[in-house]
Swiss-Prot record:
Protein name: Probable alpha-glucuronidase A
E.C. no: 3.2.1.139
Residue positions the entry lists as glycosylated: N49, N101, N148, N221, N278, N309, N342, N460, N522, N571, N677, N727
Region forming the signal peptide: 1-18
Segments crossing the lipid bilayer: none
Organism: Aspergillus oryzae (strain ATCC 42149 / RIB 40) (Yellow koji mold)
Highest taxon of source: Eukaryota
InterPro entries the record matches: A-glucoronidase_C_sf, Glyco_hydro_67_aGlcAse, Glyco_hydro_67_aGlcAse_N, Glyco_hydro_67_C, Glyco_hydro_67_cat, Glycoside_hydrolase_SF, Hex-like_dom2
Catalytically driven reaction(s): an alpha-D-glucuronoside + H2O = D-glucuronate + an alcohol
Key words, A-Z: Carbohydrate metabolism, Glycoprotein, Glycosidase, Hydrolase, Polysaccharide degradation, Secreted, Signal, Xylan degradation
Length: 835
């Protein structure tokens, strides 16, 4: 069902005090509802044969709190018959049929589904199970919170039974690829005592119809299976259970050896089989409704069955068989590849690994067992594995945490990316084979299928480190329930719930978010070349050279004349041939391959002309300039909302967008300069290397500063920066400004390294224009860098600075720790200039 929004003659109450994001989209902010309005709403909540500890009890509490906050009406909670007047009735389908004797009027309900009927003061919320009833309660509150008091009568059910989120939380409290603070589950090797944040996380997840959460990292630590920690898992499960959410855990394949002391972890060894069965029994004794296991094996250094020459199916089935008596599910990751492959062999290709490893094992996995071939890139084709496993239950893995996509310091709304994948038709056996229908189990008539998303919330009050990034978690839940929903419609529901119903706010955030994925793709990696980030270090800033000359397999094969991976059957790695015939034909042919995947499937000259008529290299140059300009537009769009959003969230989002605008220029210049240097082909528009408004730091008069050759070279404006001569020496860089007199935005590009908090002051004629501290490790969430590079490169801008031709500009840098107060350049920007 597509959720709709009907305009009514109600409007939000004026903005209240500051908000910190903790409530996410469950703010239940007040809407205007006078006494007449309140009288037209229910007066009580009726639950049938339920207890307070289950999801229906939770639903009644949510409804009571929600109605009081949204419309100011207090509702009592009763356990009575279905005939109560002026009430919200909450029940399971079975309870409703037994108590109300109205079987004929109840629509059929599918997996976790619900029926919502609301006519004024009479509301019925009937779930296929208690979980479904809770989902219906959240749905009703969502409508009210958006000002929708209209009559509704509809049913909706889940697209697939498995709708999980994964946390890559480590036992020490850190989170792998997490950008929002420490774990809410673990610290110092144990489960935390205070689980209050876990309860709020459960509320958020249940409201978007998530039914399972894996609480620990796929690169798992066997110590999670100690008796003390299994007791802690039971406490976590007790918090999630009232919200209809089951917990599961990731396992380390070698645990029978490293924790159990068996001296082996061979999945066919009887002692190993017995060990896993006993561990599983112990877990289910503590958590009877545990969802199951997630296993990463034989990949990226993780142990697996290949150590004993066992197949991946044999490795998976030792867990699946241990789970079967308890009804648990094993999710076995297909993210399996050799990260030591030799790039000099033309036919080697990491993208082939999933099909190579798993296709021949189809049908050998027990029944209770990544969307792209590489690793959550800004653009990848759909994994061909979806078209090659007919007899195996499958789920799709997405990433809410933005590992390769700006790490929540760049606005990137991901629903359009996901929708493009889900709507893709693989044409298996020349029949309609949409990815969304494959993962649901519908296409190949499988009983089990679904979704998993790596989320990685932390202790930051915004959950993901950024207010706007929460749109991705919300969208994931909505799509996992109903993948035909519209990305913009999902987004606008989230905006109204999170920021209110001001049309200006709705329009601005909608435009920004819908433009954000194309913008990020434009200023990072284009035409299917991947994200061009540093794959060997932080996965954050630009470093295109890191893609090649290593065994990780994310190669671009770029040289002086050509670029791209040849994945054709005719002349390349054969990856195109892993797709069904109709799709393989498209990708095999250079002319029919879509431009946005050209370099994924083909190795071509930089001068190759796209369907647009541009050459590959000119498309690179233009796209990177376009993307950076779009990122700067986000900033002005957000600033137009000042006074329409509470001050705290306005300022926190503004800070991220200011940073994104500056870092988009780092990306733009780095990628363009790298390929200009490699190819020797100039930009037709003569923009590269032409920066008339910049003053390079190394060209200024230096005292206590010295030039420094930056690596990678392209992450500095003129390939150089300046650093203090020692970590105890204050540096000064000054110059006479040769610009027309006027008002400028004065920007300073510098490097904010991890391990120090340098301080800078900028003067114009001894007048202080601005001061700042290099403390981004405290204010931003991305993985920091200890180097002067594209990860630490950033910009600060002081607006409206009056400059006279001939003024003296001076910057004083005070180093701290390992950070030598590094500077790249100064830029004086006239109005409407982006550089």
């Amino acid at each position: 069902m597509r959720w709709s929004f009907l305009t009514v003659l109600l409007w939000l109450v004026s903005l209240t005090g500051a908000e910190n994001g903790f409530n996410g989209w469950l703010r239940y902010a007040p809407v205007q509802c006078d006494k007449r309005c309140q009288r037209a709403l229910p007066s009580s909540i009726v639950t049938l044969n339920s207890t307070d500890s289950g999801p229906i009890g939770t639903a009644s509490q949510e409804l009571q709190a929600g109605l009081e906050n949204i419309v100011g009406k207090q509702l009592s909670i009763k356990r009575s018959s279905c005939g109560s007047r002026s009430s919200i009735l909450v029940a399971t389908l079975e309870q409703y049929r037994q108590a109300c004797n109205r079987s004929s009027e109840v629509p059929s309900l599918g997996i976790d589904g619900f029926w919502l009927r609301a006519y004024g003061d009479t509301v019925q919320i009937v779930g296929e199970n208690e979980r479904g009833a809770l989902y219906g309660a959240f749905e009703y509150l969502s409508l009210l919170a958006q000002g929708n008091f209209s009559h509704v009568d509809y049913t909706t059910s889940a697209h697939a039974p498995v709708r999980w989120v994964n946390q890559w939380d480590n036992m020490d409290g850190s989170i792998e690829r997490g950008y929002a603070g420490p774990s809410i589950f673990f610290e110092d090797g144990h489960i935390v005592e205070d689980l209050s944040r876990v309860k709020q996380y459960a509320r958020l997840l249940a409201s978007i119809r998530i039914n399972g959460v894996i609480v620990n990292n796929v690169n798992a630590n066997a110590t999670l299976l100690t008796s003390q920690n299994m007791d802690g898992l039971a406490r976590i499960a007790n918090v999630f259970r009232p919200y209809g959410i089951q917990i599961g855990i990731s396992l380390n394949f070698a645990s029978p050896d490293t924790l159990g002391g068996l001296g082996t972890y061979d999945p066919l060894d009887p002692s190993v089989i017995s060990w896993w069965a006993n561990i599983t029994d112990s877990l289910y004794d503590r958590v009877p409704d545990m969802a199951g296991y997630l296993v990463k094996a034989s990949s990226e250094g993780q142990p697996g069955p290949d150590t004993y020459n066992r197949t991946l199916a044999e490795g998976a089935n030792v867990f699946a068989k241990a789970l079967q008596p308890h009804g648990g599910i094993l999710m076995f990751r297909t993210f399996v590849y050799d990260h030591h492959i030799n790039e000099s062999i033309w036919t080697n290709d990491r993208a082939n690994a999933q099909v190579d490893f798993f296709k021949e094992l189809d049908g050998q996995f027990e029944d209770n067992i990544k969307y792209g071939p590489i690793d959550f890139q800004v653009r990848e084709p759909v994994s061909p594995l979806f078209a090659n496993l007919y007899k195996t239950n499958m789920a799709i893995e997405l990433q809410v945490t933005q590992e390769y996509l700006g790490q929540q310091d760049h606005l990137v709304y991901l629903s359009p990316l996901w929708k493009e994948l889900l709507d893709f038709d693989l044409r298996v056996d020349h029949q309609p084979s949409l990815v969304r229908d494959i993962v649901s189990g519908q296409r190949f008539d499988r009983q089990l299928g679904g979704w998993a998303a790596v989320v990685n919330v932390g202790t930051n009050t915004t959950w993901l480190g950024s207010h706007l990034a929460m749109s991705n978690l919300y969208a994931y839940g909505r799509l996992a329930w109903s993948p035909t929903d519209d990305s913009q419609g999902i987004l606008q529901d989230w905006i109204r719930l999170t920021f209110g119903r001001d049309q200006n706010v709705l329009d601005a955030i909608t435009d920004m978010s819908m433009a954000s994925w194309p913008a990020y793709e434009n200023y990072t990696g284009n035409l299917g070349i991947q994200t061009l980030t540093d794959i060997l270090y932080t996965h954050y800033g630009p470093n295109p050279a890191s893609q090649d000359n290593n065994g990780w397999g994310q190669w671009t094969r770029a040289d002086h004349d050509t670029i791209g991976m040849d994945r054709t059957v005719k002349n390349g790695t054969g990856n195109a041939g892993q797709y069904p015939a109709e799709i393989a034909q498209v990708y095999e042919d250079l002319d029919s391959t879509p431009d946005d995947l050209l370099l994924w499937f083909h190795h071509v000259p930089y001068t190759h002309r796209l369907h647009s008529g541009k050459t590959v290299i000119q498309h690179f140059y233009d796209a990177h300039y376009d993307g950076a300009e779009t990122a700067h537009r986000f900033l002005s769009q957000w600033e137009s909302l000042k006074g329409r959003i509470d001050q705290q969230r306005y300022n926190e989002v503004l800070s991220r967008l200011v940073y994104q605008a500056g870092h988009s220029l780092v990306w733009r210049d780095a990628i363009n300069n790298f390929y200009w240097n490699m190819s020797g082909i100039s930009d037709e528009k003569n923009r590269l290397g032409h920066h008339p408004w910049r003053v390079e730091a190394e060209s200024m008069t230096l005292d206590g500063y010295e030039p420094y050759t930056v690596s990678p070279f392209e992450t500095a404006s003129n390939y150089k920066a300046v650093v203090t001569t020692s970590n105890s020496t204050t540096g000064t860089a000054q110059t006479k400004l040769q610009f027309p007199s006027g008002t400028y935005d004065l920007g300073v590009n510098y490097y904010d390294m991890y391990g120090g908090k340098s301080e800078w002051t900028v003067y114009v004629n001894d007048r202080v224009v601005g001061q700042w501290e290099g403390n981004s490790e405290n204010t931003l969430g991305h993985t920091p860098s200890i180097y002067i590079d594209g990860h630490s490169a950033t910009r600060i801008t002081f607006r409206g600075v009056e400059i006279e031709n001939g003024d003296q500009l001076k910057i004083v840098g005070v180093p701290d720790g390992v950070e030598p107060a590094p500077l790249d350049y100064v830029v004086l920007l006239p109005p409407d200039v982006v550089d």
